[in-house]
A protein has these predicted regions:
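Non-catalytic interaction-recognition regions
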Residues: 1-93, 107-585
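Short, charged, solvent-exposed linker or helix-capping segments at domain edges/interfaces
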Residues: 94-99
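A short, compositionally biased domain-edge/stem linker segment
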Residues: 101-106
């Protein structure tokens, strides 16, 4: 289905053309004065200069050319040259009837849909997920769903931090704590144990202890570097121990991400890119892009059009060590071979904007990707506490992600118990649904690039622009439909008879347009803005229109069909945001 706004443009473009003006001036927008009209066209104002006519003359000429049109119940030219438009009730009902029957409620696949690698998550193994990992996971999961909704083949890759010094630190600490382990015995030739010699809790204790110790103990730090070297050069014991670290960590990560309703298609990491580094470096060198700078191998990426300095991208340090840029470029080589994507999207903290700008420029200059491959980075803002600083525990430490989820769920559970509207059997699942809505909507309703304040009281409120308010609207519609008790599939959506009904129908008609905006801009906040407007219109409609006591059966069936369509659209949209609605609240 075409967007309603595009259908309006087709009518206005034809009228502008018939009146002797360029059709492009027929673009319409939502009215910023809904008390006067629903849509408006300012094309006459823009055309006045080109055609040396007063805007109101042009507007009147276009209005005459438009004539009687079934799309509009009213069209008028007003000073200084606006065209004010109201959609015909019959046309609006017809549009929604078609929308209700169409796949995806009329939203169509992007004609340019392609294969997209979406790189999000990015946790380090052997470390617990904390609140700093929340935004990448939540935004990434939503974008993955939105991209797929419009027909793209999306590969979600977690890109684990599973290589480097952190591994050597853990191994050196383990060697001191458990010296009898066979992994550190150079003479050991047998099979290594199938079970890991540690739990996830032990791992999460060992790493920070080792990291702190390395800053005080030079000999220990040197041993950690030696263990890292041995791992990266394929020593049998270190490799076996590393596999245990990876397995135990990934099992815990999967449990935590599953608890958040986030999933990944590919669980690869920095380690998987290592074998592609020589090939990548050879390609970059062959292009003549590398220069030596103080013993390091770098690629200058500054361009004449840059307003500020963009430093060279360092590929190999003077001591031979590689960096994140090296790994990211090698990962691109790997992904090109495995997936042949037409688009890459990376989600990280916005402090990495420069890093990705450097990486993308090297990838293009070296021909690691084709000239028309899209390379994109979304740098997200910080989740802050009410003090405006990065969110912490009450003790001032970094809060674990599972602690945050538990805190939000407990808070929501206590609110549900106060209302006593849910049975004990349904309580855990209902609380989880509402907690996820509070947490995810609270994040996603903000522009990804902006910082936001985490406010549990506000995010979990059942009123206002919140996830629980959206869920409340869906659950209330389900309750009304259950009381109505008849199938709505065969009901005819009739033209609106009240302002509240028409407003709800107008908002419904904009679903595809709103979701396309979210897709085009990689901005889930556009989905949130849309469903808040839709939920508000729905609540006003069923508050002012007595659906269950309506005596006219045909009209009542139409009301039921309308709110059922609203429910379906809302549920489609919250699925794109990564949460779902309970049966009761």
């Amino acid at each position: 289905m075409k967007f309603l706004i595009d259908l309006i443009f087709e009518q206005l473009a034809g009228a502008f053309e018939r009146a002797g003006f360029d059709a492009a001036y027929g673009k319409a927008t939502l009215s910023n004065r809904p008390d006067l009209c629903e849509y408006q066209c300012n094309g006459a104002l823009a055309a006045a200069k080109q055609y040396h006519k007063a805007p109101i003359q042009i507007a009147n000429a276009v209005l005459d050319a438009l004539g009687e049109n079934e799309m509009f119940s009213s069209a008028e030219a007003v000073m200084p040259g606006f065209l004010n438009l109201k959609i015909s009730e019959d046309y609006l009902a017809s549009y929604l009837r078609e929308m209700a029957q169409a796949p995806h409620y009329g939203a169509q696949d992007d004609p340019a849909a392609c294969t997209i690698v979406l790189d999000y998550g990015g946790p380090n193994v052997a470390k617990p997920l904390h609140v700093g990992h929340l935004r990448s996971a939540i935004i990434g999961e939503s974008l993955k769903r939105i991209y797929r909704f419009f027909g793209n083949h999306v590969i979600g890759d977690i890109h684990l931090g599973d290589w480097g010094l952190q591994m050597g630190l853990i191994m050196a600490q383990l060697q001191d704590e458990k010296p009898g382990l066979p992994y550190f015995d150079p003479d050991y030739t047998g099979e290594y144990p199938a079970e890991a010699p540690f739990t996830i809790s032990e791992l999460e204790r060992i790493y920070p202890a080792a990291s702190a110790r390395s800053k005080e103990d030079e000999a220990f730090a040197a041993r950690a570097h030696e263990e890292t070297f041995r791992l990266q050069h394929g020593e049998r014991g270190e490799r076996a121990l590393w596999q245990h670290i990876l397995r135990v960590s990934v099992e815990d990560l999967k449990r935590n991400y599953d608890n958040l309703g986030v999933s990944f298609d590919v669980w690869l990491g920095e380690s998987d890119a290592q074998k592609y580094i020589p090939q990548m470096l050879e390609t970059v060198k062959a292009r003549g892009l590398c220069v030596e700078s103080e013993g390091a191998l770098v690629v200058p990426v500054q361009e004449e059009t840059d307003a500020k300095e963009v430093p060279p991208c360092i590929l190999v340090k003077s001591d031979g060590a590689t960096l994140y840029a090296t790994t990211d470029l090698a990962t691109i080589v790997q992904r090109e071979q495995d997936y042949h994507p037409q688009k890459y999207m990376y989600l990280t903290d916005k402090r990495q904007n420069l890093h990705f700008e450097q990486v993308f420029r090297v990838a293009k200059k070296a021909g690691l990707v084709s000239a028309d491959t899209q390379l994109g980075h979304i740098g997200f803002g910080t989740m802050n506490g009410k003090d405006g600083k990065p969110f912490k525990t009450r003790a001032g430490g970094v809060m674990r992600l599972e602690t945050l989820i538990a805190d939000v769920t407990d808070y929501v559970t206590s609110k549900i118990k106060e209302n006593q509207t849910v049975s004990d059997e349904e309580l855990p699942q209902t609380a989880k649904c509402i907690a996820m809505a509070a947490l995810k909507y609270g994040d996603l309703s903000n522009l990804p690039t902006k910082d936001y304040v985490f406010d549990l009281d506000r995010f979990s409120s059942f009123e206002g622009n919140t996830g629980p308010y959206i869920l409340y609207t869906i659950v209330r519609i389900k309750s009304i439909l259950a009381k109505y008790g008849k199938p709505v599939s065969g009901a005819q959506l009739l033209p609106p008879e009240s302002a509240e009904q028409k407003q709800l129908m107008l908002v419904l008609s904009r679903m595809s347009d709103a979701l396309w905006t979210a897709y085009r801009d990689s901005a889930p906040n556009a989905v949130c803005a849309y469903i808040y407007e839709l939920a508000t219109a729905a609540n006003k409609f069923y508050h002012d229109v007595k659906i269950l006591t309506e005596p006219d059966e045909r009209r009542q069936a139409s009301y039921a069909a309308l709110i059922d369509l609203t429910r379906g659209v809302l549920e489609t949209c919250i699925d794109l945001l990564g949460f779902s609605a309970p049966e009761r609240m």
